[in-house]
Curated annotation (Swiss-Prot):
It is an enzyme of class 3 (hydrolase). It comes from Fowlpox virus (strain NVSL) (FPV). InterPro entries: Pep_tRNA_hydro_II_dom_sf, PTH2. One of its GO terms (molecular function) is peptidyl-tRNA hydrolase activity. Transmembrane segments: none annotated. Keywords: Hydrolase. Belongs to the PTH2 family. The keyword Signal does not apply. This is Putative peptidyl-tRNA hydrolase.
Length: 124
C-alpha cells in the first residue's frame, strides 16, 4: 500500500487544528457544522496568507485535529499566541447577532508551530 505522505519529518508535516469551546455544550451536530464552516474559511484565508503551507497540507493528506478548551478566554489566549508566531487562524461565530465565538481553527501550519499552542490541550 502506498504511503500518502511524502518523506517530510513529523515535525514539518502540516495540520489544521480545531479548538472547540467545551463550556458551550454544543451537540455533535453543532460542533461538526461549526468545524466545517471554520475549515472552509481557514482554507480560503490560507490561499492568501500562507499558500505554500496550504499546498503542502493538501498534498500530504490534509491532517486535522480537534482539541477542547474550557472557555472563551482560553481560546482567545491561543489565538493571540497564534497571531504572535504568524500562524493562520479563523474564529467561527455561531450567530452573527450574538457573536458567540465557538471554534478557533488554526492552520494549516507545520506541527512544530503547534507545540506552544495546543500541545497541552485534551482531544475532543
Amino acid at each position: 500500500m502506498a504511503n500518502v505522505f511524502d518523506n517530510s519529518s513529523y515535525r514539518d508535516m502540516l495540520k489544521m487544528v480545531f479548538v472547540i469551546r467545551d463550556d458551550l455544550k454544543m451537540t455533535k451536530g453543532e460542533i461538526v457544522s461549526q468545524c466545517c464552516h471554520g475549515a472552509i474559511s481557514a482554507y480560503e484565508k490560507s490561499k492568501k496568507y500562507s499558500p505554500d503551507y496550504l499546498k503542502r497540507w493538501l498534498k500530504n493528506g490534509q491532517v486535522k485535529e480537534t482539541v477542547k478548551v474550557d472557555n472563551e478566554n482560553e481560546m482567545m489566549d491561543i489565538r493571540e499566541n497564534a497571531t504572535a508566531i504568524g500562524v493562520n487562524y479563523y474564529i467561527v461565530q455561531n450567530d452573527k447577532r450574538q457573536k458567540c465565538n465557538t471554534v478557533l481553527v488554526i492552520g494549516p501550519a507545520p506541527n512544530y508551530m503547534f507545540e506552544s499552542l495546543t500541545r497541552s490541550l485534551k482531544p475532543l
